[in-house]
Amino acid sequence: MLEQLPYLALKTPPKTTALLKAECADFIVKEHLGYEMSGDGEFVALYVRKTDCNTLFVGEKLAKFAGVSERNMGYAGLKDRRAVTEQWFCLQMPGMETPDFSQFELDGVEILTVTRHNRKIRTGSLEGNYFDILLRGAEESDELKVRLDFVANFGFPNYFTEQRFGREGHNLTQALRWAQGEIKVKDRKKRSFYLSAARSEIFNLVVAARIAKGATNQVLPNDIVQLAGSHSWFKADEKEDLTVLQVRLENQDILLTAPLIGEDILAASDIENEIVNQHSAFDSLMKQERMKAVRRPLLMKAKGFSWAFEPEGLRLKFYLPAGSYATALVRELVNYTEE
């Protein structure tokens, strides 16, 4: 699936091999919500460090310890299990004392902060994540250094990676069967997973087509472009001067986007329209399920991107906004194998 997608850096697969997540400590993620806890309110907020632990499993254990329903537990995003991750959880406990979480015990879990907050921490309510990744066995080479410089300066394809599609692409396979009327899907969680996989596939294919045509840094007629630093976007139609927009793109004032298909999707560039039309079953499914079309940047540039070669391999440190995948960046640098 992902292995079929083209590369942006050097237009070829990386020559360097590396192990990813050989140890949990090789993949460190720290969540950034973008706001501070209020210090009071009906929600107990917990900042937790997890090692080799599933987000939902830990959340359920915290809720059970506090004596509240799992429905009253919240978090901003699911984190990788095979990793060391830090993230916030909240428990709705109006009029109740904060439990003594110093008595909470769970292998691989350390509660770093306990406070209060005045609203629920909801899925998606985060700005991004800080990453500290060790690529074991990655040796210094001219080719790898060129790739590192490229990613630092120009970014990487903002692909959705394997975890979006389920084990061996199961979610995408089921989405196609659903779209073709072969199955019915009643479970709400499965419906969400399958719809996300289908939209992600179309997005990836549009990005891949732009790379194949050498159009990742070129504003095409009818492109949908996004203002940098916001989610506002507009169409590069006949009312817009493409020459002016091209300068704005090169100055990183605007970003090219690709679609997460759904209702009210706009006709865009010919490249994009061709891909969407080739997958009309998915397009129809999104409209049937009343999914609203949204835009996502075609490329992503990591903030604070730095690297260092160590005896064990290559260490990367960077920040990505919510929704972008660290593994999409890593695949531009090395041919990695996950342990």
From Swiss-Prot:
Reported function: Responsible for synthesis of pseudouridine from uracil-13 in transfer RNAs.
GO BP annotations, alphabetical order: tRNA pseudouridine synthesis
Source species of the chain: Haemophilus influenzae (strain 86-028NP)
Segments crossing the lipid bilayer: none
Cysteines paired by S-S bonds: none
A Pfam family: TruD
Gene Ontology cellular-component annotations: cytosol
InterPro entries membership: PsdUridine_synth_cat_dom_sf, PsdUridine_synth_TruD, PsdUridine_synth_TruD_CS, PsdUridine_synth_TruD_insert, TruD_catalytic, TruD_insert_sf, TruD_pseudoU_synthase
Family assignment from sequence similarity: Belongs to the pseudouridine synthase TruD family.
The protein's name: tRNA pseudouridine synthase D
The EC number(s) this enzyme carries: 5.4.99.27
